[in-house]
Each structure stands twice: as structure tokens, then as C-alpha cells.
């Protein structure tokens, strides 16, 4: 008989019991030591794979970042297209601030395998400058001259120095000339490539699902092997679309989608959905009314302007229209200081009446007519 077995069988019942207890303690303590060593010295690293489904209300219209003007299109475009600044290996600004020399990274390619060169960048700039395209980037690129230095180099010339022009470069998405170059500007928004995009971002278009009534229910994207940046870990990225808040709510409740993002208030409470965490992220957007004193002489009067400001109940707008998902801003731009932001409002109905009446008394009850112009969205 094996000596170890002989010793074990020579144990009494009590000795065997204590042997197993000691063995269990040894195993548990060893596992605990290993776990502690991993926790203190190990490095957690993500692995590639899996899928993610993002829910959206509404429909994609044009997954083309230089014509997109709605949040759905813009968010989808952000995973398909790269911004100009992210494609650069270097840039130089002239001492007078009017010339920018840009150099692209070597070996850039679109997700269909075609080379991405300075021709694509120049084509993008000239396209956004074309008024027939109606690009939201048009104003920020007006008057900018773009010249080809080489396959990788672009020279930009500004009519006047603009200290924030580098931000224009950082935010400009680049579109492929070999896809859109032959499309007339008047048909630019009608191209099928706006729904089957070719880009250079972290993900590339694979397919979409459309119902018989024309409603697009899902987009499917996969990692772009030609992406110049850090490769994404998620293997399959889906965008799922819903016609109303109730459908989105039910999909979230059944875990048919992993999450959603919305800049507009929704008709349901997320606290009623098990396993869902709500994260509120501040967005660099604001709603404001600007006084155009040139188009309406009435607005040159300080009492009128102050009266209009006092007459607007910002807190009620935040609570009733935006569902409390906003902060009151009392000055242009953004700041984290309490004097600029917070829940304080200039609303004072009595003061507004006094200011308006002071103007009317001064101007012999002159009628007050003001036109409010809003963007078409």
C-alpha cells in the first residue's frame, strides 16, 4: 500500500476530520492569497467581442456628417467618420495666424480600402463651402482657401487671422471624394451613400433593416480594420430605432436594447426599469434669444430689453419643457461658476410690467411689435 494512504487509513475518525478541516483551510487560504495578489498586482484589461444596442427615437435621414443637422444622424456619423484633426500627423500655423499647413498620417484608408488623401480633405472643405449643399459647417469655413501641397499635405489660407480656427479643424469630418465627387450638389442629400455610408471612423457600415412601410428599424456596424486610431473592442454595434417613447421604454424594459441617449425629455421614468442606470451628462448646447437691434429699433431701448428678460420664466421652461434636465444660464457661453449658471432666474413679472410701461409712457403708448425668428428643425 502507498505509504501516504497507509498513514491516512491509520488515522482515527477524529484525526481524519481534523485533517479535512486543515486541508480545507489550506485550500481557502491559498485561493485568498492568489486573489489578493491578482488584485494588488494584476491589471484588468478589456477583450474584444460582444455587442451593444443603442436605442433611438425617430429615423436616420442622412448619415453624412457634413449635411447632418439632427442628433440621430450626428451620433451615428460620429462612429463612421473621422474628424480632420484626428487624421493629422502634424500641423503648423504661420506667425500671422493666416496660414495653416496640415500633414496627414501615412497609410490612411477609407473603410472600403481606398486611400484617404489630401484630395478628400480639400473636396470636403469645398463641399461644405457650397451653399447648395446647406452644410452646418458652411459659416465656419467661409473664405478659407484650401490648396493641395502633396498627397499628404494641405495648405489652408484665411482672409483674416482667427485664433479659434484650430477648433474648426478639430471638428470638421472628412468625407470620401471617390464616393461623392461625381454627385451634383443639388442631389447631394439624395444619395444612397447617405444611408450606406463609407467612412474612416472606428466602425464601418454592414447592413440595415427596413420594414415594408419604409421604417428603418436597425443599423448594424462592425469594427473598421482600416481605422487609424485605437481599434474598438465591441464587435457588433447596433442602432435600433423606435417610433415613440413607449416602444423604446418596452425595448429597454425587455433588455432588447442596452441603452439610449436623448437630449429631449421622455414620457417615462427610468427608475421603474430593473438593471438600468441613468447617467446625466452635461452637453455644450444652450437655447437663447438674441436681440437684433438693427432689424428692430425698439430693441435699442434698454427698458424693452430688460423687460423682455424679466418676463421670461426660465425655471418654468426648464421644468415643464425640458423635464428639469437643464440648467439656467444667465450669460453667453458656459461656466461652472454659480454667478453664471444654476437655478437662479431673472424672472420678475412685476418688474417686467414696470419696465415696459416706462417705455410706453416715454414713447406716448407707441405699439410694441417684436418678431421672434426660430430655426427650422
Residue ranges of model-derived segments:
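Aromatic- and charge-enriched surface segment that lines or borders ligand/interaction sites
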Residues: 91-134, 147-157, 251-254, 298, ...
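Surface-exposed binding/hinge segments that line
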Residues: 33-36, 136-184
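Append "and occasionally in soluble cytosolic enzymes with long acidic Gly/Pro-rich linkers
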Residues: 215-223, 300-377
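Gly/Pro-rich hinge or "lid" segments in bacterial periplasmic/extracellular proteins
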Residues: 172-231, 236, 246, 354
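Ligand-site clamp/hinge motif
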Residues: 224-270
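N-terminal lobe/hinge region of extracytoplasmic solute-binding protein
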Residues: 55-97, 103, 126, 198-200
